[in-house]
Design a protein with these regions (language model features):
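Cell wall/extracellular polymer interaction/catalysis modules
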Residues: 22-156, 163-186
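Hydrophobic alpha-helical membrane-insertion segments, chiefly the h-region
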Residues: 13-24
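N-terminal Sec-pathway targeting helices
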Residues: 1-14
Length: 186
């Protein structure tokens, strides 16, 4: 019995240390301000919504907040969230592989225009359609890449948020006169 208790404690201790190590992996400071300034300039140049923008920092792992809704007028983050990425390729919870290929189940980098909010495949889950604006994400519509409420850190390429954060995002985007841009970068 003692050997099993000691073995169990050692295993638990190893798991705890490893888990803590994985959670702090890539805990670098987030330079949201400079990325937000770049996104704001892009939005103004292209004629998109210059009030809000969404940044997705795929350099951070999916156990960290990496989706940021930025209010350009007040120069601040108004929402931050965990954000899942695609499970395709060699993606893990800690690192995403990227592809624009149909059927890849990978996330794609680049700028997206947020489209209409709709039900996700006749289920009670809501989602925002995304239009890829760059060569790296031009297949977003054919691939059905969305921002959706979801469970877990991996998706089929969509940007998935916890349900409460999705509801908050929906509230922010509701009634805005122009399309908001998402910029996913690594």
């Amino acid at each position: 019995k003692k050997i099993f208790k000691i073995s169990g404690l050692l295993a638990l201790g190893t798991f705890a240390i490893t888990g803590i190590g994985l959670l702090v992996y890539n805990l670098r400071p987030v330079d949201i301000k400079s990325k937000a300034d770049e996104l704001e300039a892009y939005c103004k140049t292209k004629g998109y919504n210059a009030d809000y923008g969404i940044l997705v920092d795929y350099e951070r792992n999916s156990l960290q907040k990496r989706l940021f809704v930025y209010d350009f007028n007040n120069d601040k983050v108004v929402m931050s969230s965990l954000g899942g990425h695609g499970s395709g390729g060699n993606s893990t919870v800690f690192r995403a592989d990227f592809s624009n290929a149909c059927g890849s189940h990978c996330s794609s980098l680049g700028h997206y225009r947020i489209g209409r909010e709709r039900r996700m495949y006749n289920r009670p889950i809501m989602a925002f359609e995304l239009d890829g604006l760059d060569r790296t994400n031009s297949n977003a519509r054919p691939r059905a890449i969305l921002i959706n409420a979801g469970v877990g850190p991996l998706s089929w390429g969509c940007i998935s948020l916890p349900f409460t954060r999705y509801a908050q995002l929906s509230g922010i985007l509701e009634g805005l006169p122009k399309n908001v841009i998402v910029w996913a970068y690594d």
